[in-house]
Amino acid sequence: MSSSEPPPRYEPPVEPVNGIVQPPVIPPAERPGRNTNQLQYLIKTVMKVIWKHHFSWPFQQPVDAKKLNLPDYHKIIKQPMDMGTIKKRLENNYYWSAKETIQDFNTMFNNCYVYNKPGEDVVVMAQTLEKVFLQKIESMPKEELELEPVTAKGGKKKQRAPATPKSSSGGAGASTGSGTSSAAVTSGPGSGSTKVSVAASSAQQSGLQGATGAGGGSSSTPGTQPGSGAGGAIAARPVSAMGGTVSSTAGGAPSIPPISTMPPHTVPGSTNTTTTAMAGGVGGPGAAGANPNAAALMASLLNAGQTGAYPGAPGQTAVNSSSLLDGSTAAVAAAAAAAAAAAAAAGGAAGAAGGAGTIPAVAVNAANAVQAYVNAGVSVGVDAVIPPQQPAKIKKGVKRKADTTTPTANAFESPYTQMDSKSAKIATRRESNRQDLTFQGSGYNMSPLGVSGVPGLGGLVAGGVAGVAVAKNKEKLSDALKSCNEILKELFSKKHSGYAWPFYKPVDAEMLGLHDYHDIIKKPMDLGTVKRKMDNREYKSAPEFAADVRLIFTNCYKYNPPDHDVVAMGRKLQDVFEMRYANIPDEPVANAAHHHGHGHGHGHGHGHGHGHGHGHGHGHGYGGSSSLKHDASDSSSEDSSDTENESNSDEERSARLKMLESKLLGLQEEIRKLSEEASAKKKAKKKLKEKKKSIGGGSGSGSASHHCHATGGGANAGGAGGPGSGGHGSVSVPGGVGSLGPGGAGGANLNALLGGSLVGHGGAAVAGGVPNVGALHSQVHDVAMAFSQMAGGGAAAGAGFGAGVTAAGASSGGKAGTLAGALAAGAAAGAGGTTAGSGSSKGAKSKGGRGAKGSGAGGVGASNNAAAGNAAGGAAGAAAGAGSVGGVGGAGAAGGGNASKRAKGSSSAGAGGGVGGANASAGGAGARGSSKKKPSQVMNFDSEEEDTAKPMSYDEKRQLSLDINKLPGDKLGRVVHIIQNREPSLRDSNPDEIEIDFETLKPSTLRELESYVASCLRKKTHKKPSGKSKDEQMAEKKQELEKRLQDVTGQLGASKKTAKKDESASSKVEAVQPANPVSSSSSSSDSSSSSSSDSSSSDSSDSEAGDGDERPPRKKKSRDSNGSNVNNPSINVVMGGNLPSGALSPTTMLMGLDHVVNSNTPTSQMSNMLGNANPLTAAAMLNNNNKTSLPGSNFGGAPAPGNMMHAGAGVPVAGAAVSASTGQQHNKNGPNDLSKVQPGGPINAALPPHSFAGGTATVATSQSSGGIRIASNLHKPSGLGGGDLGEHHAALAAALTSGINSTGTAGGGINNNGGSNNNANPLGGSHGDAMVNASLASLASGLKQIPQFDDPVEQSLASLEFSAGSTGKSGLTDNFLMQQHLMQPAGPQQQQQQQQQQPFGHQQQQQQQQQQQQQQQQHMDYVTELLSKGAENVGGMNGNHLLNFNLDMAAAYQQKHPQQQQQQAHNNGFNVADFGMAGFDGLNMTAASFLDLEPSLQQQQMQQMQLQQQHHQQQQQQTHQQQQQHQQQHHQQQQQQQLTQQQLQQQQQQQQQQQHLQQQQHQQQHHQAANKLLIIPKPIESMMPSPPDKQQLQQHQKVLPPQQSPSDMKLHPNAAAAAAVASAQAKLVQTFKANEQNLKNASSWSSLASANSPQSHTSSSSSSSKAKPAMDSFQQFRNKAKERDRLKLLEAAEKEKKNQKEAAEKEQQRKHHKSSSSSLTSAAVAQAAAIAAATAAAAVTLGAAAAAALASSASNPSGGSSSGGAGSTSQQAITGDRDRDRDRERERERSGSGGGQSGNGNNSSNSANSNGPGSAGSGGSGGGGGSGPASAGGPNSGGGGTANSNSGGGGGGGGPALLNAGSNSNSGVGSGGAASSNSNSSVGGIVGSGGPGSNSQGSSGGGGGGPASGGGMGSGAIDYGQQVAVLTQVAANAQAQHVAAAVAAQAILAASPLGAMESGRKSVHDAQPQISRVEDIKASPGGQGQSSPAQQSPQDRAAAKRAEQRRAEQERRRREALAGQIDMNMQSDLMAAFEETL
């Protein structure tokens, strides 16, 4: 490097002599110049041509100010430059590198533009010269090689020598622009050592990059260039490269630095860079990580970032963007550094996927992510940065205009613009494509960078992908965006330059002396930035673009006085713009609008204060595009950021303006959409396929928008904006989240990604780091915003990582959102690692194939992130991307077109690094898909077509030339347009005098011309040109796309076929993808599905949520879902009735609901529910199914006033933020929206800040409730009684669980966060919440999915197409469709997949266990897939999939199983697996997030553990003995146990599989049942006969899941909670599954109860197993396997039974019901809980420890070992034995944080069962505390504890539970657990009493914690309590399966009928009161009570099912009637989706 690293270039200012300044031309001794090939080229070719140009004379000598009478010239122009000086310098070897020469040229031109007015002759001359210059530079050698000094002349010093060769390769600008920060980071392969030194000088400049690897990396490979670009450029020439840019203070030559700076960014875009980046990336992350200094570097880099205004900003990316470069930047940088350090530390050992390997990928990722952050931030951080991204390439060619035009150019910007802008613009188009993507991802999100950084995962992949992907990832622009691009080009044309020039470049406040500019203008924007974003495909819709353009004008009007010239110019330019914009094509808009428009209308409605809602709305619209199209969202997000950040008065003005504009846009779009609908529908099918690919994106979008919503108004915009903004920064979403969180799924996902993913990826390391980042971000961005966003985005992430989420959340909000987006992206990248990267990297492209898929989601997500807030998708995708799921999710995020391509990558996403790489690929693929989307779209050409276009022969060219000559004049414009769009070098050419040489055109351009000319001539002369006709081309393209899609998603086209499904089933993860589009396909297709789901989810949530403006729709949906619940009051009544507690009186409930809804504090609602334990609240919550109110008030224990207790502590703080966020969102979106948004926003917010995990959980729950209910209702409107209650309860339980889990599981996290919130529980709250949420989400997903498929075929279809999924059921389908499609198409699909998978999952749990071995292999794939899925969920479900992100992770896990599960899913279209895998879901969320993140290993371990636990649970359910064995095994060998368990599991799996096979048939029933809570098994046949009814029935039975479904769709957090509950239930159900099979309707409950008993489980399983029609080959396969598996399982069960019998008997004796449920699940639950707790704790702890804990608990699945400590200590992670676990638990207990696991240990001491649950529970509670005592309580209590765990009391053991109880009641759950869950105070008693106390309070107490308390449950809270008890029981069962989910679920279960049900099963009598109540509520096919459902004959069940179906039918009709109320948009979306699915 020394040779390539020039000394800093310092040119002291020269005083003018006689008006002339002659800069030095002789190189100083200390800085000799060099002679390089590039410099030779410059002097011999470039200078020669330019010097001879007839316009060069004014520039050939220094300006003589005296002679020209320019007295102020040297005051304005501080660094004069002229060609004469440059020429002399070239001749004297003054330059070190060509970059410096180019900088001088740019300085010269800029001086001209700055001093002279646009339009003046000299300016025109300069522009002409600059064009020539750039065109010449285009052909400059890419590699800068030092020549022998022989030619003394050629040498120029290139400051950036080190990376110079590469950077130079980037192009003149490229070399300078090599600074893609992420690339640099990733690229640091060789940078290891140099890094430090480079970092030293360049650290500040490069921000993170240089240090991390940019410096080294850059030199090391061209690839590193992208990384090196920023880093290298910075490092090499810190001052000029980054210095100027970064700190603008650094660097000797201000002008130069900017240029450098830009170029670095540019470089990333450059192809070279990309490629190199990859290579470099591989080593880079490692190198960075390897560097012990990595952390320091990161810190320094971050600090550097801080130091550098820009870098700092970048660090804060989002923040920066918003001009939030406050001290927070430093904080952020510090946090990032800390995170990096943490990551490094944590990750260090983990092992880097990246090259260095020294530092774990995680650490690297973390560092990278941070770096990416900072770097991205740097490049994107400031709005000014915009250009940097753009100039990915050196090809500055035609782009100079922007630069030229800006008289005021930021120091860094101007250069960038000039150099990069051009280059970027040009290059960007070409190479920047990939870069663009990366940048796109990172865009504002910085996601790409993040990805790149994160790519630590794929380190190289990410890096490479980021670079390459970026370069390659330009999607085709939609027609609307093409038109926008044309408008943009026009604005840059000479025609308008006279009044547009002030807007071409970022305002250089320093240079212009506008010191208050950034105080007033929080979100600077300029046309250069817009152009960069456009080139980088950061705009997913026209409104997004328009919003940015308008932002330029509003900023102008805001800052300048009205009479200022600039204002006049701005108005003039705006008139031009608005005129042009009004005429953009409908179709394109439709595309945008579609995506966008749909949501748009809603969006607007939602638009929280800022009208940013649109973005959200879009989401639904089409899902795919929506997210992409988040324009509105984007703009809104940006606006909101803007608004948020900008001063109020002006801000309000501009906000109003923007709002109106957006509304106008929205209306226009609606009109367009409607008018297009017809054509759109036609296209829909075509596009659907593509869109499916892209839909994922859409969904991401949706999520983004959701996220926005989640974010709340401001946060909303900000969040969405954050993720959404850069692409919706938050959506930044992704998850996504923003991303994932999404905000939203996107934002949350992103957040989740960020939080979880980053954390996850880095695992602990990242987690540690990320959280810091999160903190940073939070600080940077309003914490509130961040929180709200986080809540939205973080929810999913939050599950895993409060802090991380917070960061994400913070980032989500506003600028922070952007940063968050970036972070989220990063996180996603981290989680998805490459995911984000992939998204950003187009390079990964389809190559990524499957792997890419995951990443696609992530990547796309990332890109969406930037772009569509796909963050969810992106983040989610990214986060999901973290794993394959990420790919899926990512796919979803990428979802737009990307999804399809991206899908491909999914398989690749193997795991960990693979995932990263694959993800990145996927992302690339996704992006590519996007491109594909509009094959002939403008700039995207490069990405896809260029790769695929066939070179043209001479004859063809000649024919084409002749044909063009035949074209009429009016057709030639389009020809030029095509060429200019596709040929960067010609982009700036004047169309009227363009010269075209066919030999120089790219094949893709020629092919596009050919098809266009052919179409024109065909029409005209009907003669086909020689080339293929456009139709043929389109057909071929379509075929190829379909083929690719199939490859990628296995979803589209052929993939839609069930065959594909079968394949996928067989193919496991990959197969799963196809089979369950949700899974892999889900990745892409589902990603589209997901995105669609997201969007649909978003939509649904939006529309449902009233589309942001009315909750009713959502309510409707819920109601619809509920059917029975149709009437809130009635439900309330029912609820009330069921819940004996009078408190639940309908009025109260309603009030609560409405109140809650109104409060919009789902969290508060949840808290209330949770905290309140008042039946009323609970009832409301339950009711909320119908309504959304439920979610808000009841559950939001924290926020709700009622829940002040909980809220009191943490809530006020975090809760408040969340609450507000939630509330707003809630109002806006209603639970659904909330769920989406909230999950993202509130939950995350809640989680991180929260302390009231409960609240968050609640939110999730309530939303969950709504969602689930929806599903439930959909399925069985009339089944409300049991089912509904169950559902409500499930929701409640989920919420409670969420809260509890949050409290408990998250325990530690919440404690910190929400210590306040849940007293003892708070600690876990956040995490648990997230986890629970995730579980709930899973559940919800499952439920959603359940409703979706009635019919196996339908299911298959649904699997294949998310829309199909939504279509799965007619009645359900309608509402569901709307919900699903709008809200949660992807989610449902994913969930369907999950559930389908889960049905497999149950069987597959066994299978999973069998497959666990495979899965271990698969683990990576699965994880990847999970991640993919998660991402997808994140992206796809965006808001929904915040949770879903986690959920998806769970799903991903499931998807791991899912592959198997998918097979199962095939069974009924019900994805029982989802529930079955609830634990997995919950775990997956956390685990996935952080397992994903952390290590594939851990993930695998966790998965295994989860699987094991599930197995254990199943086994426990099947046989306590197994559990004991597992425990023993666990003891003996946690790790071995995993293997052993795997073996055992395999046996179990086989046994279970056999059972499952039996079950499967039943499970088909069960799947439905499982979906419904897995309580009611439905024969497939039944399902098939009356799909709706059956499904409804099942859903009823699976009420929880159904509740979740909507919530899934709506409240991610709630969904997560619901999912957790559902998953817990599912697990319970699974536990009972065999029995469940027998349980059809109400009897199913008792059957479940009996199933709970180990003996009955097995027997019932076998006995109940009826031969059901094989749903598909999967089932048949299962059937075959069943026998063997069952035998094996039986053997294993026998053994385990013996071992466990003692414990089981104790437990059984204790409370046969509870015992059996609990004990079976107890141990499993304990394990699950432990794992969940660990997971939550891990999440809380940032996943490192948590991951370990998870692993540990996973290892310890044996029921008792709760990994108590697992969460707390990662070390014990997998290896820790039970002792360790116990120690940990003790630690936890001691700490109270419990890591949630502590209880485990204690409990574990009790019987395995008892401790299992207890510990889990207690663990959750962190306090666990009671947990320990709980353990005394015995399995039941233990189990309860688990659920309670969050409560800390949970503690199962009554005692602790009590403790907790006080705190959150959750603990109550522990005991009766569940019951208490609700009750706050009672809790204690509850726990102790096992529920009675708990019962008593609405806490539902517990349901009596157990059966015993069943009566107690019945007592006041019966409704709630019993449900809770049932839930608890179920949860206990489920817990085993998914501890995390179970924990949450249990608490919730306790609170919900399910618990009672379960209890009832155990003690039918106890349950019966509940049952009767349930029956009251709904004659409950799944009625909990029915005494002996188990005994019910299949016929009875069938009858019940039929009745249920009938009810469902009625409900469906009712719902349909309601649906009428649902927005037409939704309907149209549904219709389109329907058609598409059809």
From Swiss-Prot:
<feature type="domain" description="Bromo 2">
    <location>
        <begin position="475"/>
        <end position="584"/>
    </location>
</feature>
<feature type="region of interest" description="Disordered">
    <location>
        <begin position="1217"/>
        <end position="1260"/>
    </location>
</feature>
<feature type="transmembrane region" description="Helical">
    <location>
        <begin position="816"/>
        <end position="830"/>
    </location>
</feature>
<feature type="modified residue" description="Phosphoserine">
    <location>
        <position position="1980"/>
    </location>
</feature>
<feature type="compositionally biased region" description="Gly residues">
    <location>
        <begin position="711"/>
        <end position="735"/>
    </location>
</feature>
<feature type="region of interest" description="Disordered">
    <location>
        <begin position="1502"/>
        <end position="1530"/>
    </location>
</feature>
<feature type="region of interest" description="Disordered">
    <location>
        <begin position="1957"/>
        <end position="2023"/>
    </location>
</feature>
<feature type="transmembrane region" description="Helical">
    <location>
        <begin position="451"/>
        <end position="471"/>
    </location>
</feature>
<feature type="region of interest" description="Disordered">
    <location>
        <begin position="832"/>
        <end position="858"/>
    </location>
</feature>
<feature type="modified residue" description="Phosphoserine">
    <location>
        <position position="1653"/>
    </location>
</feature>
<dbReference type="InterPro" id="IPR038336">
    <property type="entry name" value="NET_sf"/>
</dbReference>
<dbReference type="InterPro" id="IPR036427">
    <property type="entry name" value="Bromodomain-like_sf"/>
</dbReference>
<dbReference type="Pfam" id="PF17035">
    <property type="entry name" value="BET"/>
</dbReference>
<keyword id="KW-0472">Membrane</keyword>
<feature type="modified residue" description="Phosphoserine">
    <location>
        <position position="452"/>
    </location>
</feature>
<feature type="compositionally biased region" description="Low complexity">
    <location>
        <begin position="177"/>
        <end position="209"/>
    </location>
</feature>
<comment type="function">
    <text>Required maternally for proper expression of other homeotic genes involved in pattern formation, such as Ubx.</text>
</comment>
<feature type="compositionally biased region" description="Polar residues">
    <location>
        <begin position="404"/>
        <end position="421"/>
    </location>
</feature>
<keyword id="KW-0677">Repeat</keyword>
<feature type="modified residue" description="Phosphoserine">
    <location>
        <position position="1988"/>
    </location>
</feature>
<dbReference type="Pfam" id="PF00439">
    <property type="entry name" value="Bromodomain"/>
</dbReference>
<dbReference type="InterPro" id="IPR043508">
    <property type="entry name" value="Bromo_Brdt_I"/>
</dbReference>
<feature type="region of interest" description="Disordered">
    <location>
        <begin position="1580"/>
        <end position="1616"/>
    </location>
</feature>
<dbReference type="GO" id="GO:0106140">
    <property type="term" value="F:P-TEFb complex binding"/>
</dbReference>
<feature type="domain" description="Bromo 1">
    <location>
        <begin position="34"/>
        <end position="140"/>
    </location>
</feature>
<feature type="compositionally biased region" description="Gly residues">
    <location>
        <begin position="1814"/>
        <end position="1828"/>
    </location>
</feature>
<dbReference type="GO" id="GO:0004674">
    <property type="term" value="F:protein serine/threonine kinase activity"/>
</dbReference>
<dbReference type="GO" id="GO:0006338">
    <property type="term" value="P:chromatin remodeling"/>
</dbReference>
<dbReference type="GO" id="GO:0032968">
    <property type="term" value="P:positive regulation of transcription elongation by RNA polymerase II"/>
</dbReference>
<feature type="compositionally biased region" description="Low complexity">
    <location>
        <begin position="1857"/>
        <end position="1884"/>
    </location>
</feature>
<feature type="region of interest" description="Disordered">
    <location>
        <begin position="1745"/>
        <end position="1918"/>
    </location>
</feature>
<dbReference type="Pfam" id="PF17105">
    <property type="entry name" value="BRD4_CDT"/>
</dbReference>
<feature type="region of interest" description="Disordered">
    <location>
        <begin position="1384"/>
        <end position="1416"/>
    </location>
</feature>
<dbReference type="GO" id="GO:0000977">
    <property type="term" value="F:RNA polymerase II transcription regulatory region sequence-specific DNA binding"/>
</dbReference>
<keyword id="KW-0597">Phosphoprotein</keyword>
<feature type="compositionally biased region" description="Low complexity">
    <location>
        <begin position="1716"/>
        <end position="1728"/>
    </location>
</feature>
<dbReference type="GO" id="GO:0003682">
    <property type="term" value="F:chromatin binding"/>
</dbReference>
<keyword id="KW-0103">Bromodomain</keyword>
<dbReference type="GO" id="GO:0048813">
    <property type="term" value="P:dendrite morphogenesis"/>
</dbReference>
<feature type="compositionally biased region" description="Basic and acidic residues">
    <location>
        <begin position="1998"/>
        <end position="2017"/>
    </location>
</feature>
<keyword id="KW-1133">Transmembrane helix</keyword>
<keyword id="KW-0812">Transmembrane</keyword>
